[in-house]
């Protein structure tokens, strides 16, 4: 958590204002600091001791957020869609209320776009759906198109407190990965993002018609599926894999993170496999549960 220990934090807030609030069910990484920022005990198991001065608040509960803010809080960090937390999107009203409060009280807004960023939700950054302009944005995964890269975007206010060498990583800025990232960024034009949005609409419409689907969550091509009838997402995952479709799970939901280059034909093929799997499970499910 570079911002908590950065020159910006110390010179702007003083050494005693160094607490970061994150959300319950969040996931922010696997270093000790980002594990601490992660609001899920399951990821803390077998690690530690952890850095101090992090606090966890429930998502979409503005009153609890306000009650948690004291003179030690310098930043709040959020995922617009909690991926590892069940593919749950934050409420727009909650995000706006938090943003207004942070701006009024000089609290930095950090948005973790590692899963949601670089076109995943149909906009370059997911926070665009919320009309949110964070002070800091973290990126990785999609930025490299399969190559390992991470980036931190910041506004001028924060950047003024950073200097050459103040933060970095072993392979940060290496030319091969940056060349790959440049290709990815060049592809992120309006027509590319429009296709992502169109395929998301197609996918979600098809999923809603499938048997045993209770509800859908997420934004764009970041989709969570909850099932009726006691069907377990892990069982659906295994059955899909046998038929050639790779999916994930998150909490009790099936999680879909398809390639952003997918076509209408790809969507229909995936829907066909899911339909086969869920139809078979529906036939085996107790009638009173289905």
List each model region and its residues.
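Conserved N-terminal phosphate-binding loop of PLP-dependent enzymes in the Aspartate aminotransferase
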Residues: 4-290
